[in-house]
């Protein structure tokens, strides 16, 4: 299972509501492709969502 995203953990103290929404989006995206063969895709989705929301 894909671990909780680092950016969500970092930002949760400063923007809990927004972070909770982002976390749900990430988890929903991950749950749609949850296989061992898709680990790279999981990481790409995680990075894309984090960059979209936090400009990291």
Curated annotation (Swiss-Prot):
Lineage: Eukaryota, Metazoa, Ecdysozoa, Arthropoda, Hexapoda
Function: Male determiner protein (M-factor) that controls male somatic sexual differentiation. Acts as a dominant factor that regulates the mRNA splicing of doublesex (dsx) transcripts and promotes expression of male splice forms of dsx.
Leader sequence residues: none
One of the protein's GO biological processes: male sex determination
Inactivation phenotype: Male-specific lethality in embryos.
Keywords recorded for this protein, A-Z: Differentiation, mRNA processing, mRNA splicing, Sexual differentiation
UniProt key word Signal: no
Transmembrane segments: none
Protein name: Male determiner protein Yob
DNA-binding listed as a keyword: no
Domain of life: Eukaryota
């Amino acid at each position: 299972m894909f671990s909780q995203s680092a950016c969500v953990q970092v930002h949760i103290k400063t923007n809990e509501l927004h972070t909770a929404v982002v976390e749900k989006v990430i988890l929903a995206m991950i749950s749609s492709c949850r296989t061992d063969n898709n680990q790279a895709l999981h990481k790409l989705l995680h990075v894309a969502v984090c960059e979209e929301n936090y400009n990291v």
